[in-house]
Amino acid sequence: ATSSAASDVYKRQAMEDYKIDIMIESGPNARTVQLNLNPFTLVGATTRSGFLTNPMRERFAISNRLEHYDDDLLSQIVERSSGILKLKIDKKSCFEIARRSRGTPRISNSLLRRVRDFAQIKSDGKIDLEITKFALSSLNVDKNGLDEMDNKILETIVDKYNGGPVGLSTIATSLSENSETIEEVYEPFLIQQGFIIRTPRGRQVTEKGYNHLGRNKNNQNNLFN
């Protein structure tokens, strides 16, 4: 989240003094009105802390970095959510959903509901490992949590650009997708999981990315030599 210098001043004043000075009118008639605020606790969250000004960032007394949930904890979340939804599901199915959820509870709960829909049609509402894998496969969510667009990005870099490096805008054009969407929605997970890396010349698929696609990196490179 970005913030302007003017809005930062208001925020910092409110955080420090529980007051805001507002300028009314302009020119010779300009005057300042002070608004008193009730004491409050401000909690901020951003994926772009570098965009905050230093004075603004330093006003927060406690600064923590949140990590993605691990599969075991996500599995517990899926199990709890299934209880709330009154679903019949075994632990193996909970874990299978969890490990394809990209470390995010919101995705876990979304996948659980989609798996439930398949189970209601295919197995009288009971969710076992077989129906879970079938549902997730039908949704194009693979065993590593990559969806259709994730895999298209990898395939495009490998098949069209010899595995990279290739620029983001070129990838976006090849996929008829917006550059910002690829950079902000898909790329972070692919980098975090080690499927691609950023280089000064662009994005490049790693050996792990080749293995995920079932390709041999050396053989692939030989095709272009």
Residue ranges and their predicted role:
Residues 101-114, 126-128, 146-147, 165:
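The conserved phosphate-sensing helix
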